[in-house]
Design a protein with these regions (language model features):
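N-terminal pre-ligand scaffold of iron-sulfur
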Residues: 2-92, 125-140
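Cys/His-enriched microdomains
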Residues: 79, 96-99
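Short, Lys/Arg-rich amphipathic alpha-helical interaction segments
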Residues: 99-140
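Short Cys/His-rich "knuckle" micro-motifs
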Residues: 88-93, 108-112
């Protein structure tokens, strides 16, 4: 499998600046009982295939990256590279992978397996479920 790298400049990589933004509407999600509930109507970032958003802070126990993938499914990851520094991840369009925003470009498949870079282990993935106009991410 050939690895595709996101087009990021050296400063973005050195400072670990992710390409994926926080939600335009900070109220698009709620967290309760180990579940994140995302309202699709308030999360336009997830409307298009390849779209993604990062959720962090606001009482969440960990950072989460949510991706609307090319295969028609949604995926959620602990948004933390397993390499030194624990930088954030970004989806790589058309590849079924997410990649660390740092200089090492550690890359993982949607099942969390490492396929490129120095980390020794996988990233944590979370079960997701579409329930009407909501996406539920199970952190437990």
């Amino acid at each position: 499998m050939a690895i595709k790298f996101l087009n990021r400049n050296i400063f973005q990589r050195i400072f670990g600046l992710p390409a994926t933004s926080k939600p335009l509407d900070p109220q698009c999600s709620t967290f309760s009982d180990g579940k994140i509930m995302i309202d699709f109507k308030r999360a336009p970032e997830l409307e298009k295939v390849g779209g993604a958003l990062r959720l962090e802070g606001d009482g969440l126990p960990r950072r989460v990256l949510v991706v609307n993938a090319d295969d028609g499914k949604f995926y959620a990851f602990h948004n933390r590279c397993t390499h030194i520094g624990h930088r954030r991840l970004d989806p790589v369009p058309g590849t079924g992978t997410v990649q660390c925003c740092s200089v090492n470009k550690s890359t993982y498949t949607y099942d969390g397996s490492k396929i490129y870079g120095p980390p020794t282990g996988p990233i944590k993935t979370f079960k997701v479920e579409v329930a009407g106009e909501r996406l539920i991410v199970f952190l437990g």
